[in-house]
């Protein structure tokens, strides 16, 4: 409704651009903006998580490319989105700690998506992302998957569960991080 009434055009024009950006790919069934909105419903009502979902794909319109068959790709959107989220959150006067955590989650929300992890990979990921952010990142990744098309959803969720299980085992073993 805020988009349709042009409210977001005033305070979050980046979102309007996302609403107008198609995702022509088997993994997606919505525009970027529609996917963002859908993803919000898959995280708890936590400020950091909701902001991370609002911004997790905000960089996609800036990096979109398309194959000759029309399939869209968004390489590097995590880093671009994190920089955009930082600017937006400064503009909207969010506190620095919230902005830093949200930007970290945005930057790394696709980290390890194609990797079948072992404990060493989990330790490396936690060291890169931060132990304070890792469990939140798993929630962001789950919401992202749930808001995508059904294509390979079960496989993606199984892989994510493995990341989570190995993380919990590493913490229990005192290996993190």
Segments (PLM) and residue ranges:
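Proline-centered turn/helix-capping motifs that create local helix->coil transitions or kinks
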Residues: 2-13
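Short Gly/Pro-enriched turn/cap motifs at secondary-structure boundaries
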Residues: 27-30
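C-terminal subdomains that position terminal phosphate/3'-OH groups for nucleotidyl transfer/ligation
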Residues: 17-18, 25, 35-38, 42-177
């Amino acid at each position: 409704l805020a988009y349709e009434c042009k409210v977001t055009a005033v305070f979050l024009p980046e979102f309007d651009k996302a609403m107008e950006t198609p995702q022509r790919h088997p993994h997606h069934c919505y525009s970027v903006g529609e996917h963002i909105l859908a993803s919000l419903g898959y995280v708890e009502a936590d400020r950091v998580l909701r902001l991370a979902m609002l911004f997790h794909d905000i960089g996609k319109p800036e990096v979109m490319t398309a194959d000759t068959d029309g399939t869209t790709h968004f390489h590097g959107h995590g880093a671009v989105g994190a920089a955009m989220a930082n600017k937006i959150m400064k503009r909207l006067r969010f506190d620095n700690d919230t902005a830093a955590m949200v930007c970290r989650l945005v930057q790394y929300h696709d980290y390890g998506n194609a990797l079948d992890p072992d404990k060493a990979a989990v330790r490396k990921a936690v060291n890169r992302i931060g132990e304070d952010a890792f469990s939140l990142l798993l929630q962001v990744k789950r919401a992202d998957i749930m808001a995508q098309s059904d294509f390979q959803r079960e496989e993606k969720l199984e892989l994510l569960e493995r990341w989570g299980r190995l993380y919990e085992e590493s913490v229990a073993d005192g290996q993190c991080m």
